[in-house]
């Protein structure tokens, strides 16, 4: 089975305490949103303490055009991608020796917070010594599900090409999409929740033998689920001044009524019950989302501790977030024969599930 050999994450330079983010939001929306003080409680109740951003807080005190925001997205997404790829291919926590970019057969680039044609992966190829025959697979529009979907597509590629080495790179700069003149509740909730980040994994096919320092998660199976007529649950409303967040409060209820039965079915098809999972690697979409996972899949709160800790330290970074969670399992938790389920939700409305088993 294809294995995840190495992983890395990249933290943007500007760290903001949640209390300071609340004060900035209060300043920007003062006398513009009715009952603002009541809505600002989401900053205190979301289980987030710090978040990291690609721009300083004062950047949001002035208006920026869609063109300016997107230009900055292209510049920084390229920069962060280069950094996180280099870190993944040289990660001494997992690899005995570095792997050259020239050895990579495909790159799956995942993002939803900016637009670039050619896609960011092409720009990265001009900065690192990849082969000019590298297969590029950009994925756009999957939002928070993008990290798990990238793992799934790397699995598909490596099943078809067992000698392949594939990078999955996720970069999201959610702060560049913040709209200071959008006074909707969705925008306010987004301001309390979303952050910036980047992550990269290296997935290798069955015929690639790399001696690693730790046991590695093999990908046993993947699954996808889509909900018809659900475009309004989560996504972007694209307007002249940029991307406006769509974010419905029904997501935890959807986990209970729609996702839970699918996950049980997916696991049963692999001969596993949810109680048999050693690790639950959930995208922490929010505190209520994690609680819905626990209730629906009959998990103890201990099973979501790492996801909750990533949410506390980083907020919701969209697609890279579930890989931040996976990194902690790969560094500190995974032992040979452990079984894990990686799950994320995103626009569509959709879910991605990946079943993992740690191997020597």
Residue ranges and their predicted role:
Residues 1-2, 102-105, 132-135, 161-166, ...:
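Short coil/turn connectors at secondary-structure junctions
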Residues 6-8, 110, 140, 165-172, ...:
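Short beta-strand segments
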Residues 48-62, 66-130, 141, 274-290:
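Conserved beta-ketoacyl condensing-enzyme motif
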Residues 116-122, 168-189, 221-239, 286-295, ...:
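Active-site-adjacent elements of ketosynthase-type condensing enzymes
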């Amino acid at each position: 089975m294809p294995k995840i050999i190495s992983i890395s994450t990249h933290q943007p330079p500007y760290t903001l305490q949640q209390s300071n983010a609340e004060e900035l939001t209060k300043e920007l929306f003062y006398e513009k949103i009715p009952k603002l003080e009541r809505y600002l409680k989401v900053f205190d109740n979301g289980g987030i303490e710090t978040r990291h951003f690609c721009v300083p807080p004062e950047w949001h005190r002035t208006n920026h055009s869609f063109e300016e925001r997107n230009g900055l997205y292209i510049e920084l997404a390229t920069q962060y991608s280069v950094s996180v790829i280099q870190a993944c291919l040289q990660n001494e926590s997992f690899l005995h020796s570095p792997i050259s970019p020239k050895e990579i057969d495909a790159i799956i680039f995942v993002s939803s917070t900016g637009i670039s044609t050619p896609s960011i992966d092409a720009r990265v190829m001009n900065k690192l010594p990849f082969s000019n025959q590298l297969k590029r697979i950009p994925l756009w529009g999957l939002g928070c599900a993008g990290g798990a979907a990238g793992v799934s597509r790397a699995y598909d590629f490596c099943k078809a090409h067992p000698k392949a080495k594939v990078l999955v790179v996720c970069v999201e700069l959610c702060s560049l999409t913040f709209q200071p003149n959008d006074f909707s509740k969705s925008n306010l909730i987004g301001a309390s929740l979303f952050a910036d980040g980047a992550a990269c994994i290296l997935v290798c096919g069955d015929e690639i033998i790399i001696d690693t320092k730790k046991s590695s998660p093999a990908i046993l199976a993947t699954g996808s689920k889509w909900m018809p007529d659900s475009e309004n649950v989560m996504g972007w409303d694209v307007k002249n001044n940029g991307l406006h967040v769509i974010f419905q409060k029904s997501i935890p209820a959807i986990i209970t009524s729609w996702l839970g039965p699918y996950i049980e079915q997916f696991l049963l098809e692999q001969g596993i019950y949810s109680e048999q999972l050693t690790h639950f690697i959930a995208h922490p979409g929010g505190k209520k989302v994690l609680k819905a996972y626990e209730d629906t899949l009959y998990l103890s709160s201990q099973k979501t501790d790492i996801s909750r800790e990533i949410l506390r330290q980083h907020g919701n970074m969209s697609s890279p977030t579930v890989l931040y969670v996976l990194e902690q399992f790969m560094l500190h938790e995974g032992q040979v024969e452990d079984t894990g389920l990686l799950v994320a939700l995103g626009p569509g409305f959709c879910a991605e599930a990946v079943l993992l088993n740690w191997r020597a």
